[in-house]
Amino acid sequence: MSHSDKMGASRLLPCQGGGSDQHLRLLNDRDSIYVPHLREGKGSFRVFTEGDDLYDAMIAAINGARKDIRLESFIFAADEVGGRFAKALADRARAGVDVRFHFDSRGSLTNPSTRLYQELMNAGVQLKWYHPWSWRHPSRYFQRDHRKILVIDEQEVFLGGFNIRIENSRVLYGEGRQRDTHVGVQGELARRAAMLFDRLWNYTEDPHVNAIPEDTSEVEALLVPNSSRRCQQRLACLHAGLISESQSYVYLTTPFFCPDTMIGTAMQAAARRGIDVRLLVPRNSDPPFAGWATRAAYEPLLKDGVRIFEYLPRKLHAKTSVIDGWTIIGSANLDHLSLFVNHELVLIAKDPGLREELRNAYMRDLEDAAEVSLPLWMKRGWYERFVEGIGRAGRRVL
């Protein structure tokens, strides 16, 4: 059986960059994933949109670990939430469980706690800071580990957009907590998540460690990273491919939106074909510069029929896509840093239950959002246009 036969109906794309026609070329190369052929899933996913529910589930999983724990987070704060995780990790390490914790040195820079880190190490937890500042290699500091992963005994994995901090807790932070999304699943995906964790932990690019199996026809979900020597645009290609193949709707949620040519072109083309293309972004971005860059992309999208909504009540941090029967959940924003620079990880699935749960959550979010009107947008003042220009010029640092 040929490789293309094994891949079934998979359609694959060379991730070579920005040309508007490049995402239409199909090659037999699974490292450049376009539209994989997955079987329909059976509802084995748990979706979390409240930090308290997620943290309780993660800590319960940590407490039940028997062999090993792998935790990776962009932000680990020395607050009540971080303290709960630290205690659980330390307890399991003292019980003989192999506990490894990899967190980003810049993401956690604003909430440092030497005492907390020392307590973890004293308990036997292995810690690593990803890309701390180095005068010898300053350029490395601009590539971050933005992934959020917890793997328990290579049997269960949690991943998504939630960091470990109090701002995600309704109980501790109140109604102003962040709006985010995470997913939990057991089985083969946990083993593959462990492989990806190990690859970054060991700073290796092992060719034998591949998150995408040879044959995807019997797989209901994939973990797709954007770190590959052969393809530096895997996530952009994935989104552009699914949007280009859409037949009914495209519902995107992202806190930072600075699309590359492939994604922007695919969204506009889909809207012109009559597809219901919607984009949900925050009204108030943090930092404000990110909002300027996001709004710089509005006009061409609106003119082609893309509907844009701005989320109002609180900070939006979720990164999800619901495209016909497909769902994507993970750590990646639709911006330059997430698509092309940082380490990210997303789950892509073809599961009716997961799709409906995320689609319903999207519709609920739209009830708390304001739609951007093209006629009113075209009347915006000189100051808005000026700061959009600044955002457009600096979009590659987002």
Where are these regions (language model features)?
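Charged, low-complexity intrinsically disordered terminal segments
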Residues: 2-398
